[in-house]
């Protein structure tokens, strides 16, 4: 797309060597599981996005190949191929083999650059068994190849001249090293979600993904940028005003973009990004937005006498944000990331900039669009009234529990340990399974809470109504950290919550209802990795005095074939947890030595919000469509 040659070997700065990467890969890409594997693709794509941010690229193609490799192609300026003075090697080779070598550290070649770990393609090279690069620049096509990070020097060559009108650009194709990664199989959906997000955040850049293994493909191009992102997130919701509110500004080299739309939902959905990174832990940009939003809404509401119902109180932030979908995107030349997972923006100056932009532009928008302002404020007033009712309900609950002999729910069989780090709570479907679990557990560190039937669907109710539900109240009390905005993970009584439901449709529904409650009202538990789903076996196979458990039909068939010579003594199918006696339940599902647990994680909060809304919200159409689209992906079928 661009022939701009400001970006050459002279702009490539080198900060440190590559030796440690293969020894400690997790330090550089976070982990060596599926998340780390996909991070490799994001590192390469981030380079192409940086070219786009600098105005030199508007098309990026990602392809998953049948041989397990992945390639990323862009139409940017092409990685420099001229000789690097310090190393006396081609700049391309330096970028690929030296950690932190790149044109992103002097703010001249790139004003803004993404990439959470910022480790660049050299780490991708170090963690690949093989990597190939094709560069189109300086009037020619160049290729180079690397094996386990080592340059195959004789393979750096100028292949041919560029054709007249042919685009410049870079293609990187790599094969992840299966000696390092737990899995080397890329997941189309995981990549699709991230690439869609990047296309929303970088309007006008076309990003395509194709999968040779399945012939699946997707192309994303959003001229409306984060405006369209908000529309996408609200697809299954009812908006309170037609147009998405959008404003942007630049101050001190920091770009701010904000889009929002209020809906009639009870859950808000606010997503903040810094340099294209999903800042899941929030940060100064989010704080600035929330503070200014609450102030602007209260200023407008007070000046138009709209808060008479609240007995002189102002609206709180949580009232204003109820049902609000918003995307905040800042681009910063020198972002500082903090927090446990380095996904919290720490630059203090950003708060003031976002506050002032929001105060000024949203205030003006409200004055010019009184109908929209009224719709948003009426919803917030309704939320404030419900919050006050919920407070009364909570106080009532607290008073009630203080009168009871113990503040813990009667049906909780607690564990002896008082150390949350070694304690686990099994949340069990049904009293009969609860009885078996209580008898089969190790009471030193395992607590059991049986739940009767299906709990309330919290997606459709406010907190005051939720707190009226006995089963939910018992669960909140047992976990111990409170609920909603006041939830405090430090006060949680267990660091493992294990959802134990039957392996049928009802069990899956109950598990989804529980996850909705935990995600919406105790989300830190999921973010800290405290929530698990038990995986009880579906089948038990006996043969000549030996017992084998199978999680699914495929495993059952393999056991029958390989362990029982095709002729088992007995095959038992567990229809429900209640069918297992205490010993079987301990043996298959509760014993830490041999049980299988599935940790519940949230990779992408925007996708999770949308998913809970589709599955548990009011709109039937999107749910039907989702079931239709994913019927073939189901992991089990209940007959």
From Swiss-Prot:
GO terms for cellular component: chromosome; cytoplasm. Residues 392-402 have a biased composition (Basic and acidic residues). Induction: Expressed in mid-log phase; not induced by novobiocin. Changing residue 82 to G: In Nov(r); Allows cells to grow in about 1000 times higher novobiocin concentrations. Residues 423-537 form the Toprim domain. Novobiocin inhibits DNA gyrase activity by binding to GyrB and blocking access of ATP to its binding site on this subunit. The mutations in GyrB causing novobiocin-resistance probably produce a gyrase that binds novobiocin less avidly. Few gyrases are as efficient as E.coli at forming negative supercoils. Not all organisms have 2 type II topoisomerases; in organisms with a single type II topoisomerase this enzyme also has to decatenate newly replicated chromosomes. This is DNA gyrase subunit B. It comes from Haloferax lucentense (strain DSM 14919 / JCM 9276 / NCIMB 13854 / Aa 2.2). The gene is gyrB.
């Amino acid at each position: 797309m661009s022939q701009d040659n400001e970006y050459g070997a002279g702009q490539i700065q080198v900060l440190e060597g590559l030796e440690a990467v293969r020894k400690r890969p997790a330090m550089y890409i976070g982990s060596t599981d599926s998340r780390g594997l996909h991070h490799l693709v994001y590192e390469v794509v981030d380079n192409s996005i940086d070219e786009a941010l600098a105005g030199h690229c508007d098309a990026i193609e990602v392809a998953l190949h049948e041989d397990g490799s992945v390639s990323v192609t862009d139409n940017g300026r092409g990685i420099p191929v001229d000789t690097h003075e310090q190393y006396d090697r081609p700049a391309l080779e330096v970028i690929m083999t030296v950690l932190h070598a790149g044109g992103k550290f002097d703010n001249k070649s790139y004003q803004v650059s993404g990439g959470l770990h910022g480790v660049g393609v050299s780490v991708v090279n170090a963690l690949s068994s093989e990597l190939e690069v094709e560069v189109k620049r300086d009037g020619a096509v160049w290729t180079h190849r690397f094996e386990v990070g080592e340059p195959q020097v004789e393979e750096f060559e100028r292949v041919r001249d560029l054709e007249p009108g042919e685009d410049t650009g870079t293609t990187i194709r790599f094969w992840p090293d299966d000696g390092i990664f737990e899995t080397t199989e890329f997941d189309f959906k995981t990549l699709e979600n991230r690439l869609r997000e990047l296309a929303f955040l970088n309007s006008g850049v076309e990003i395509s993904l194709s999968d040779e293994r399945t012939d699946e493909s997707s192309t994303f191009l959003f001229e409306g940028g984060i405006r369209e992102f908000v529309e996408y997130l609200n697809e299954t919701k009812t908006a309170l005003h037609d147009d998405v509110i959008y404003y942007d500004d630049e101050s001190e080299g920091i770009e701010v973009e904000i889009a929002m739309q209020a809906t009639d939902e009870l859950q808000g959905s606010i997503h903040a990004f810094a340099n294209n990174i999903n800042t899941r832990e929030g940060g100064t940009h989010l704080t600035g937005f929330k503070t200014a939003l609450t102030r602007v809404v209260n200023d407008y509401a007070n000046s138009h006498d709209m808060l008479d119902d609240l007995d002189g109180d102002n609206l709180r932030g949580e009232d204003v944000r109820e049902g609000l979908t918003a995307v905040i995107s800042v681009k910063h030349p020198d972002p500082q990331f903090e927090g446990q997972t380095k996904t919290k923006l720490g630059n203090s100056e950003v708060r003031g900039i976002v506050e002032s932009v929001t105060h000024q532009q949203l205030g003006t928008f409200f004055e010019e669009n009184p109908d929209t302002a009224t719709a948003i404020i009426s919803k917030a007033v309704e939320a404030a009234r419900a919050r006050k009712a919920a407070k009364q309900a909570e106080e009532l609950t607290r008073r009630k529990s203080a009168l009871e002999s113990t503040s813990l729910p009667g049906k909780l069989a607690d564990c002896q340990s008082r150390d949350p780090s070694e304690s686990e709570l099994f949340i069990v479907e049904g009293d009969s399974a609860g009885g078996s679990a209580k008898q089969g557990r190790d009471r030193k560190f395992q607590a059991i809470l049986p739940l009767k039937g299906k709990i309330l669907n919290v997606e459709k109710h406010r907190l005051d109504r939720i707190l009226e539900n006995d089963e939910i109240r018992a669960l909140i009390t047992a976990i111990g950290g409170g609920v909603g905005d006041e939830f405090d993970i430090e006060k949680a009584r267990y660091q493992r919550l294990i959802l134990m439901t039957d392996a049928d449709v009802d069990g899956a529904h109950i598990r989804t209802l529980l996850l909705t409650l935990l995600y919406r009202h105790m989300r830190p538990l999921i973010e800290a990795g405290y929530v698990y789903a038990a995986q009880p076996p579906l089948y038990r196979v006996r043969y000549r005095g030996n017992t084998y458990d199978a999680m699914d039909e495929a495993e059952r068939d393999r056991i029958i074939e390989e362990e029982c010579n095709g002729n088992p003594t007995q095959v038992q199918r567990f229809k429900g947890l209640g069918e297992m006696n205490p010993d079987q339940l301990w043996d298959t599902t509760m014993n830490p030595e041999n049980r299988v647990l599935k940790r519940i994680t949230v990779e992408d909060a925007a996708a999770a919000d949308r998913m809970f809304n589709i599955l548990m919200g009011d709109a039937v159409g999107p749910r039907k469509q989702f079931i239709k689209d994913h019927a073939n992906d189901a992991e089990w079928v209940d007959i």
